[in-house]
Amino acid sequence: MSLPQGSDYHGNGKLYFKTHKENDMKYDICDYKDIIETHKDFPIEGIEYLDLNPIYKNPIYRDALVSDCMGKIVDMIPPTFDYIGVVESRGFLVGSILAHLLDKGLLLLRSKPGRLPGETKKISHTLEYGDSQMEVQTGKGRVLIFDDVLATGGTSQAATDVLTMGGYTPIGALFPVELTFLNPTLSIPYESVIKY
């Protein structure tokens, strides 16, 4: 995978941009945390929301994040999995790009029942700010779970459980962002790119 013109190397939660100044190469470093925006009291009072949209809006930042996620997948697990299970809806964007680049199937984990046809399994779970449900179409195969943020681990554990109920084998999970101060727990191995 190649990055758009103007970027060179990235990794370890930082972006490195190549610039030309008097025919000498210089690298400008930008931390992902400088790009991600925080919004207090969203979606409810007392929650500080991390907004990854500034990364998604910029093709260089987005492609750098995708590349860092690819590196984590290669480091974390063998390439013998069938699907990337993307959690609605913020996992859909980068997760679908990863599935395309890795030539893997895309498995949708929907947050509201009734959005998937055919035989499904669903589970209720608790979020940091309320209750939710998750639903998946039944099937078979090995699944890498992808969501944008790992907070307490409740959503990811629900994804693990509903996939198992649906006949799949969850083999790991990947997150662009992990909120380590919330001490997330998950019953399967996981990796993250940016740690708070």
Each PLM stretch: what is its role?
Residues 9, 28-29, 34, 157-196:
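PRPP-dependent phosphoribosyltransferase catalytic core
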Residues 13-80, 139:
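Active-site-facing substrate-recognition patch
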Residues 79-88:
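Short glycine-rich phosphate-binding loop at a beta-alpha junction
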Residues 82, 141, 171:
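Conserved acidic residues
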Residues 93-102:
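Short Gly/Thr/Asp-enriched flexible loops that form oxyanion-binding sites at enzyme active sites
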Residues 104-144:
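Short, glycine/charge-rich flexible loops or terminal/linker lids adjacent to PRPP-binding catalytic cores
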Residues 147-160:
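Acidic, divalent-metal-coordinating active-site segment for phosphoryl/phosphodiester hydrolysis
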